[in-house]
Design a protein with these regions (language model features):
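N-proximal, solvent-exposed amphipathic alpha-helical segments enriched in charged/polar residues
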Residues: 20-63, 75-77
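A mature extracytoplasmic/lumenal domain signature
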Residues: 72-76, 127-131, 142
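Sec-dependent signal peptide recognition
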Residues: 1-8
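Short, exposed beta-strand-loop hairpins at the edges of beta-sheets
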Residues: 114-137
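Sequence contexts marking disulfide-bonded cysteines in secreted/extracellular proteins
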Residues: 23-25, 107-109, 142
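N-terminal signal peptide c-region/cleavage motif recognized by signal peptidases
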Residues: 13-15
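Mature extracytoplasmic domains of secretory-pathway proteins
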Residues: 59-109, 113
Length: 143
C-alpha cells in the first residue's frame, strides 16, 4: 500500500501546455484532469509528511489545473549534502542526473501515474533543502 501510494504521488504532476484552450479535457477520453489532479492532491496530502528514505521526505503536494506538484524535502542543508556526495566521489551534477532518472522512473512505474502522463499531463517534482533553498525542479512529461 505504501509503495503504491508513493508511486502514485510521484506520478500525478502535470504542466499546462501553452495554446491549449481547454487543457482540462484536452485528452482522448475527455476526462477532467483538473478534478483528478485536485482529488489526488487531497488523497496524498492526507498521508503527509512521508519519509521516503534516509535524508528525503515527501512533504507536500499541490495541483494547478492539470498539474500535480510533488514537494520533496532533502533533510540536509546544501553544504552537508555536498560533503556527503563529495565523500562518495560523486558530484552534485551526477546526483541531479540520478534524481531526474529516479523521478521519471517513479512517475512512470505506477500504472495510474503513467496513464495520467500519457493523457498529456506532466508530473513535477520540486526538491528543496530543509532550509528552503530549491535544489531541483523536475518535469516528467512522457513515459
Amino acid at each position: 500500500m505504501r509503495a503504491t501510494t508513493i508511486a502514485l504521488m510521484m506520478t500525478l504532476t502535470t504542466k499546462v501546455s501553452a495554446g491549449s484552450e481547454d487543457i482540462c479535457r484536452a485528452n482522448s477520453l475527455a476526462h477532467n484532469v483538473y478534478k483528478e489532479a485536485n482529488r489526488l492532491e487531497k488523497v496524498l496530502a492526507s498521508q503527509l509528511p512521508l519519509k521516503l528514505e534516509e535524508g528525503l521526505e515527501f512533504t507536500s503536494v499541490s495541483s494547478d489545473k492539470n498539474q500535480l506538484i510533488t514537494y520533496m524535502t532533502i533533510l540536509y542543508e546544501r553544504f552537508v549534502l555536498e560533503d556527503k556526495i563529495r565523500d562518495d566521489g560523486r558530484s552534485m551534477k551526477s546526483l541531479a542526473h540520478t534524481m531526474e532518472i529516479m523521478s521519471a522512473d517513479s512517475a512512470c512505474s505506477n500504472e495510474a501515474s503513467r496513464a495520467f502522463i500519457q493523457l498529456g499531463n506532466v508530473r513535477q517534482f520540486i526538491y528543496i533543502f530543509r532550509d528552503g533553498e530549491q535544489f531541483l525542479d523536475i518535469l516528467v512529461e512522457r513515459c
